[in-house]
Amino acid sequence: MSQRITIDPVTRIEGHLRIDCEIENGVVSKAWASGTMWRGMEEIVKNRDPRDAWMIVQRICGVCTTTHALSSVRAAESALNIDVPVNAQYIRNIILAAHTTHDHIVHFYQLSALDWVDITSALQADPTKASEMLKGVSTWHLNSPEEFTKVQNKIKDLVASGQLGIFANGYWGHPAMKLPPEVNLIAVAHYLQALECQRDANRVVALLGGKTPHIQNLAVGGVANPINLDGLGVLNLERLMYIKSFIDKLSDFVEQVYKVDTAVIAAFYPEWLTRGKGAVNYLSVPEFPTDSKNGSFLFPGGYIENADLSSYRPITSHSDEYLIKGIQESAKHSWYKDEAPQAPWEGTTIPAYDGWSDDGKYSWVKSPTFYGKTVEVGPLANMLVKLAAGRESTQNKLNEIVAIYQKLTGNTLEVAQLHSTLGRIIGRTVHCCELQDILQNQYSALITNIGKGDHTTFVKPNIPATGEFKGVGFLEAPRGMLSHWMVIKDGIISNYQAVVPSTWNSGPRNFNDDVGPYEQSLVGTPVADPNKPLEVVRTIHSFDPCMACAVHVVDADGNEVVSVKVL
């Protein structure tokens, strides 16, 4: 007998997401992912100066602000054929790497970890045993018995108060929770320590960007960071050294805590290396430009079809015609007019809500495709593309996680197992580890270039008063490939579309009725208790949904409390 469960809204994500599943014999047989809010930001920037768009569209989201700002600036620079000073590229790259580091740490600890960690079980842990478990795999200075005892006492105080505070409403004691008490205690301690690490990442962003969220230093043509090593109120030597101190602290936490915790979770939940396979077509764009024309990058891009790394097709630049021509969005199952597939430059965002229907329209998210195929974007796609491209650093970072996994389990971990729920989490960790090298590299590049006497950070753009110009700004954001598509006509924006990572991944069935990546990833997932569908939430959280970005103002009648309906 089949059952229907509805989770509305899914929590510990950004925005509002509803998931519906049909369950037969304890396993998900069908799924629907529904974005339940409408954004409409594209309509707001029409008829405005293209230099203003980045400041507005970063308000699409309070989490992904920096990525939208930079993607929008790149779109305008693409349309106007502007060469960006390399100092501006270095500064932008440092901001993006620090922002993404922050985002990945937030996802693992604050948004995803509580799907795997039983907070109450940590009360039974032996702090000394917990500390001993980490010897040989981590040198983190806060892995001492004394530190773990302090954390355990905090949990005891919360339980004694009758309120678990930030740890309330978890599925504690769920049969799918498998970590021993000591590992649960370690995870809670690192959850709390991660909060301070996130502050360090944001300090890097704020020192260069003016503030965060919603940075202030970008400009079409570069950045608004005047450089004078001896000056005041500018990017000087003191501020640069301050930034470097936070970069060094970030690297220590990522390498000694985040990387190790990822391997530990995988070691105790190996079955989740076989669950959660999504679209198996993967798309990622090159990132971290090192020249003024966005033609040379530190990270490669590419496309992989049907989980076959040998099918890898390189994408070498943001102006790659193969990339640009392959992207379309349709709205057959979304609450918009113009259902047929459209290129983003021609796309519209006109709402047409007519109720929720299994076989009809059921989401505010559109359905992007790449040459007609559903694809997954994000850290898993990014990792697989870089592995297929032969990037040595990516393989080395993955090998380090696999080595810890092997030490704990005695088993190896194959690439084929990465097409999974835990594969996405591992991909995100590999990406974050590589970002620490990017931060060091781009900081050194900036210092070296300044030392050569180049202090240029901005070139004034020329916006023709007549004529039409099209541009697209691609960016590999924390959740995957982001693109902003801008049409400038007679000096102002005539059309604007954002095709964001969570649109690619959370999109409903497309024009050909193919299911979206979220929906595909849930099929085959076992659910032990339909009233507590932890297994469903684990896989959805592995994508790190950001629905404020994905949808095209929140319903005033929306629930703030999670509702799980079993029919």
Curated annotation (Swiss-Prot):
Its cofactor is Ni(2+). The keyword Membrane applies. It is found in: Cell membrane. Gene3D superfamilies: Cytochrome-c3 Hydrogenase, chain B. Keywords: Cell membrane, Membrane, Metal-binding, Nickel, Oxidoreductase. It is an enzyme of class 1 (oxidoreductase). It is a peripheral membrane protein. The record marks H552, V553 as: Cleavage. Binds 1 nickel ion per subunit. Signal peptide: none annotated. It catalyses: H2 + A = AH2. GO terms for molecular function: ferredoxin hydrogenase activity; hydrogenase (acceptor) activity; nickel cation binding. It comes from the Bacteria. Its EC number is 1.12.99.6. InterPro entries: Ni-dep_hyd_lsu, Ni-dep_hyd_lsu_Ni_BS, NiFe-Hase_large, NiFe/NiFeSe_hydrgnase_LSU. Heterodimer of a large and a small subunit. Belongs to the [NiFe]/[NiFeSe] hydrogenase large subunit family. This is Hydrogenase-2 large chain. It comes from Escherichia coli (strain K12). The gene is hybC.
